[in-house]
């Protein structure tokens, strides 16, 4: 299980990302349109003024049971080994083990 502080940090990042979503979205659209170099520097300065943790690239998907940041299956929101255990004891309806 992941440390509680890491899970709390990830939740804080998620809240910041949601709070600054629209504020961050507008300047990035303006940057993609193109324009003069001075305008793009000005827009870049506005983006740099925002908190680092408000960037969506700093978020990680985590297993909602264990908090594990790696080997997540997006469809279930679980890490791979927890998903496998739950399928073995039939806690996930419709999921079957593969056999060939």
Swiss-Prot record:
NCBIfam families: PRK08881.1. The keyword Flavoprotein does not apply. Binds 16S rRNA, required for the assembly of 30S particles. One of its GO terms (molecular function) is structural constituent of ribosome. Part of the 30S ribosomal subunit. This is Small ribosomal subunit protein uS14c. Belongs to the universal ribosomal protein uS14 family. PROSITE patterns: RIBOSOMAL_S14. It comes from Pisum sativum (Garden pea). InterPro entries: Ribosomal_uS14, Ribosomal_uS14_bac/plastid, Ribosomal_uS14_CS.
